[in-house]
Amino acid sequence: MTRTLRAMRQLGALLIVSVAALSPAAAEPTIIGDKNGEDVVTVRGVGTTQSKQKLPIFPGISGETAGATGLSLLKVVIPPGASAEAHVHKGYESAVYLIQGRVETRYGEGLKKSVVNEAGDFIFIPADVPHKPTNLSETEPAIAIVARNDPNEQEHVVLYAPDDARNE
């Protein structure tokens, strides 16, 4: 893949996020219920934000939105041909359900290991394991639901850039 094509994909991913951020759906979510720990809380109308990993996310359940104290749950979209920034979740596990698409995840020290997942797969990522998901489709977004045992979803995300790994 040429650098120009790679740059165009990254720009396209940023444009998708930028346009989504301008849409009415990007408004603050409607919270139904009290975050006091005694009510069932519904989070509705959640807009798109950009994660530290440079992907559009739709925050759902977290400490901030629902008063969760031990987990977060969100929807992640990987635009066609795009990748997340390589990263780790310091001290926290992740569980992913891939709703749509095919995704290659490079992982481990130096991102030297790889797994390809498809719609319907459940994926477990142990705490502190570096990983970088890439949407294998050039035309369709990959969509996943992600759960973490971290109510502050983005707070413990640390970008990963080892000297010996090329994060293309």
Per-segment meaning from a language model:
Residues 1-12:
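Bacterial N-terminal signal peptides that target proteins for export
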Residues 11-21:
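Bacterial N-terminal signal peptides
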Residues 68-73, 139:
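Extracytoplasmic
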Residues 74-89:
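Conserved short histidine dyad/triad with adjacent acidic residue
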Residues 83, 92-118:
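A short beta-strand-loop-beta hairpin characteristic of the jelly-roll/cupin
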Residues 85-86, 105-106, 114, 125, ...:
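Short beta-strand His + acidic residue motifs that chelate non-heme Fe in jelly-roll/DSBH
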Residues 118-119, 127-154:
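Ligand-binding loop in jelly-roll beta-barrel domains
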